[in-house]
Amino acid sequence: MIVFLLKRILLLYLIFFVPKSFSENLPFFKIKSYSEKKEFFQNDNEKVGYSLGVSLGNYVNESFERQKKMGINLDKYNILLGVQDAISGNLKLSNEEISTILQKLEKNLKNAAKIEFEKSEKENLIQGKLYMKKFSEMKGVSKTSSGLLYIIDKLGEGEEIKTKNAEITVHYKGSLINGTEFDSSYKRGKPITLMLKDVILGWQEGLKYIKKGGKIKLIIPPNLGYGSNRINEIPANSILIFDIELLDIKNI
């Protein structure tokens, strides 16, 4: 039961509190000199074990800072004490007490994550509206009744998209308003072929404004993108920016 609870708690950490980089934090213990470091370890296995311990410690350090901002305060000493006692088999709390405490921690983490999610969701809506307003005032930008913004870089020639059942081949780059790139077929080195009906609404609408060989920039509001859903690196209620090159069209 305790192991199961701990796995669920660690999963919550991974989803909401994963540190950007372990190297951003100082290790809990410091080695005074290179010579001491060289003499301390007897073989590679000892170094591997130590490295795993440092990674865990850095992870805990980063988690502390994130938790403090959410009103969850834990101390390093007792975590290290718990690890030590678990290894030695000399526990200071019963399994029943530990299970109850971990259940409460899991509940607190879920509540904290929900609050953080809602805060991020509202902030994205505010910043997104400001970005859309500013972008809409730029030269060459068109706006549709649905709220989609677009700039045609190259109209293309020949075949046009005539139905949602069309099969399209595209090169594209997707990013957020802060410049974070979340996907790119260019980086993968090859275009992607898919059915128009299977892509987000912003693509379905926007790609109809260009022909085969055309290029377009789409600024997609949440209602035409992923809405309030969090998709991998894309926060809820995000404005999506896509630069798309329409390479081929097959109207089926």
Swiss-Prot record:
Pfam families: FKBP_C, FKBP_N. It is an enzyme of class 5 (isomerase). One of its GO terms (molecular function) is peptidyl-prolyl cis-trans isomerase activity. The keyword Isomerase applies. Its EC number is 5.2.1.8. Residues 165-252 form the PPIase FKBP-type domain. This is FKBP-type peptidyl-prolyl cis-trans isomerase FkpA. It comes from Buchnera aphidicola subsp. Schizaphis graminum (strain Sg). The lineage of its organism: Bacteria, Pseudomonadati, Pseudomonadota, Gammaproteobacteria, Enterobacterales.
